[in-house]
C-alpha cells in the first residue's frame, strides 16, 4: 500500500494500534495534529463508510520515503496528495494515471529528475508544486492539465519550458520558475491571459518575449538577478496596464523603455544593481513618480537635451571673453564684452554676409580690433 512506509514508521515509535489507512484524512472534518496522527479511524464517531469522503487527503510529507510501492487504494478518490520532503526519485506512471480527481499535488523537496508523462491525465489538477527537485524539463503533456491555476517549479535545473505551455493552460494564475537555468521564456507564455504572478528571477534569461502586453491580468513580474545576461526590456512591458510590481534589479539593463511612463497602476519598481543611463541613476533614486515623469517626457519629446545645446554657437547673454593685445610685443590678455544674440545660431550663419560688421571672423579674431566697452 502507499502508506506501508508510514505504518512501519509508526510501529518503530510504539504506535502499533494505528492502521495504515489512517493516513487518509478528511480535512473538512478536523485537521490532523501531525502527519503521523490520523484524524479519522474506523472507531471514531466521525467515521463514514463513504470512501469518497474518507480518502480526500493523503499526507505523507517528511516520511523519509524512497519509493512508492503499487498502492491497493482507490486513488480515484484522493483530492490532495502531499509527498513532499522525502527521498523519492521517481513518480510511477501508474500512480498519476489513476489520480483522476486530484486537485493538489505537492512533491517538493525530493530527488525527482523527471515527471511522468501521465501527469497529463490530471485534468482536474489546480495546484502543482514540484520545487526543490532535479528537473531539467517539464513534460509536454502538462498542457493537458487545463484546470491548473498554480505551478511552482522553483529550485530545479530547468533549461527550458515546454513550447506549448501557454496554449492550453488558460487558467494558470501563478507561474514560479525562479532559481533555474532558463535562457529564455517560450513565446506562448504571452497566451496566459489569466496569469497574475510571473516569477523568473535567478535564471540566465537573455531576452523576454515581445508580446508581453497580452498578459492583461499580470500584477507581479519579477525577472531580477539574471545578472550579466538580461540587458534589455521589450517596449511592450509598458503596456502591462494592470501591473503593480516590477522587479528588474541586478541585471545589465542600461535603458528603461519609455513606455514604462504609461504604467499608472505601478506601485513598486525595483531597478537597483543595473548600469542605468536612461533614466539617470539620480532620477531612479528619487521615486517611482520621478521615473515615470522622466520617461513620459522623453516619450513625448519634451525632455530638455542639454548635450545638444553645448554643440551650438552663439550668445544668449552678455559674457566676458579674452583677446590678445597686438600693440605690444608682450602679449597681455584683456577681457572684453561680447554681444547679445537673440537665439543660438550655428557658426556658418554667423560668418555669412548677414553679419558683415559685428560678427565676421576678421572682426572676431584680429589682434588689432577691439569691441568697445
UniProtKB/Swiss-Prot annotation:
Keyword terms of this UniProt record: Leucine-rich repeat, Repeat
Stretch list, region Disordered: 25-49
Native organism taxonomy: Eukaryota, Viridiplantae, Streptophyta, Embryophyta, Tracheophyta
Alphabetical list of InterPro entries matching this protein: Leu-rich_rpt (IPR001611), Leu-rich_rpt_typical-subtyp (IPR003591), LRR-SigEffector_domain (IPR050715), LRR_dom_sf (IPR032675)
LRR repeat feature ranges: 52-75, 76-98, 100-122, 123-145, 147-169, 170-192, 194-215, 216-240, 241-264, 266-286
Primary role: Leucine-rich repeat protein that likely mediates protein interactions, possibly in the context of signal transduction.
Protein name: Plant intracellular Ras-group-related LRR protein 7
Similarity remark: Belongs to the SHOC2 family.
Tissue: Specifically expressed in flowers.
Disulfide links within the chain: none
Motif (GVYW): 291-294
Amino acid at each position: 500500500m502507499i502508506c506501508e512506509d508510514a505504518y512501519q514508521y509508526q510501529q518503530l515509535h510504539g504506535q502499533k494500534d494505528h492502521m495504515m489507512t489512517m493516513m487518509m484524512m478528511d480535512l473538512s472534518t478536523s485537521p490532523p495534529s501531525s502527519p503521523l496522527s490520523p484524524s479519522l479511524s474506523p472507531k471514531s464517531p466521525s467515521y463514514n463508510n463513504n470512501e469518497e469522503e474518507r480518502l480526500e487527503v493523503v499526507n505523507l510529507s517528511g516520511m523519509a520515503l524512497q519509493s512508492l510501492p503499487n498502492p491497493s487504494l482507490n486513488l480515484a478518490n484522493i483530492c490532495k496528495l502531499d509527498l513532499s520532503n522525502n527521498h523519492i526519485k521517481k513518480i510511477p506512471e501508474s500512480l498519476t494515471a489513476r489520480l483522476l480527481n486530484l486537485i493538489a499535488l505537492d512533491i517538493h523537496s525530493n530527488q525527482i529528475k523527471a515527471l511522468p508523462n501521465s501527469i497529463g491525465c490530471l485534468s482536474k489538477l489546480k495546484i502543482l508544486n514540484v520545487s526543490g527537485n532535479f528537473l531539467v524539463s517539464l513534460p509536454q503533456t502538462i498542457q493537458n492539465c487545463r484546470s491548473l491555476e498554480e505551478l511552482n517549479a522553483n529550485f530545479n535545473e530547468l533549461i527550458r519550458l515546454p513550447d506549448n505551455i501557454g496554449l492550453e493552460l488558460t487558467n494558470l494564475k501563478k507561474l514560479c520558475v525562479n532559481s533555474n537555468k532558463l535562457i529564455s521564456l517560450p513565446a506562448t507564455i504571452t497566451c496566459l491571459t489569466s496569469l497574475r504572478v510571473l516569477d523568473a528571477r535567478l535564471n540566465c534569461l537573455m531576452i523576454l518575449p515581445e508580446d508581453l502586453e497580452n498578459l492583461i491580468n499580470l500584477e507581479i513580474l519579477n525577472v531580477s538577478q539574471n545578472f550579466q545576461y538580461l540587458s534589455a526590456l521589450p517596449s511592450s512591458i509598458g503596456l502591462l496596464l494592470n501591473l503593480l510590481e516590477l522587479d528588474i534589479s541586478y541585471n545589465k539593463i542600461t535603458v528603461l523603455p519609455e513606455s514604462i511612463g504609461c504604467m499608472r497602476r505601478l506601485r513598486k519598481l525595483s531597478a537597483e544593481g543595473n548600469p542605468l543611463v536612461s533614466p539617470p541613476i539620480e532620477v531612479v533614486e528619487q521615486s517611482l513618480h520621478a521615473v515615470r515623469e522622466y520617461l513620459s517626457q522623453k516619450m513625448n519629446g519634451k525632455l530638455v537635451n542639454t548635450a545638444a545645446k553645448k554643440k551650438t554657437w552663439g550668445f544668449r547673454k552678455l559674457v566676458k571673453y579674452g583677446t590678445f593685445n597686438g600693440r605690444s610685443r608682450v602679449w597681455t590678455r584683456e577681457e572684453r564684452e561680447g554681444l547679445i544674440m537673440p537665439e543660438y545660431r550655428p557658426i556658418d550663419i554667423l560668418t555669412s554676409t548677414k553679419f558683415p560688421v559685428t560678427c565676421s571672423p576678421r572682426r572676431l579674431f584680429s589682434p588689432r580690433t577691439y569691441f568697445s566697452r
